[in-house]
Regions:
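N-terminal presequence-like segments and the immediate start of the first folded domain
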Residues: 1-61, 65-70, 75-78, 85-136
């Protein structure tokens, strides 16, 4: 079994706290773990203060970048977890619309949508983490 720890240069530098992407390769199968992605740019500046849709879109862009760093694609994603601060039913429509821009309707990954009180920074409204599986 081989583990690889990846902190893509295109993403914010959080390496003092966690690794952005961890891959585990075993018997020709690569499992990819994507740490929670939030609505910030490379310099950790918030994108969309108070704007749930803007933060979700940026978190998904960061998520796609993290996947690419492990030579994976959205088609490899098998599970996605979304943590939403003060979740409201209307948030599901925003999330659903944006997810459909990334994943084909017939191949959506398993998903958990979890309402939380807060995230790492008080201005974060959503965090997206995932697991992907591909051939190594």
């Amino acid at each position: 079994m081989q583990k690889k720890f990846i902190n893509p240069e295109e993403l914010p530098d959080w390496k003092d706290f966690f690794t952005q992407v961890v891959t585990v390769e075993n018997h020709g199968v690569k499992t990819i773990y994507i740490s929670g992605q939030v609505g910030v740019d490379k310099q950790q500046n918030l994108v969309g203060t108070g704007d749930f849709a803007a933060q979700t879109k940026q978190a998904l862009l960061n998520f796609a970048t993290a996947l690419a760093s492990a030579n994976a694609t959205l088609a490899d994603v098998v599970k996605i977890n979304l943590y939403v601060v003060n979740y409201k039913y209307e948030d599901a429509a925003v999330i659903g619309e944006l997810l459909r821009q990334y994943f084909p309707a017939e191949k959506l990954p398993a998903c958990s949508l979890i309402g939380v009180q807060s995230l790492a920074r008080k201005e974060f409204l959503i965090e997206i983490e995932a697991t992907a599986v591909s051939e190594s």
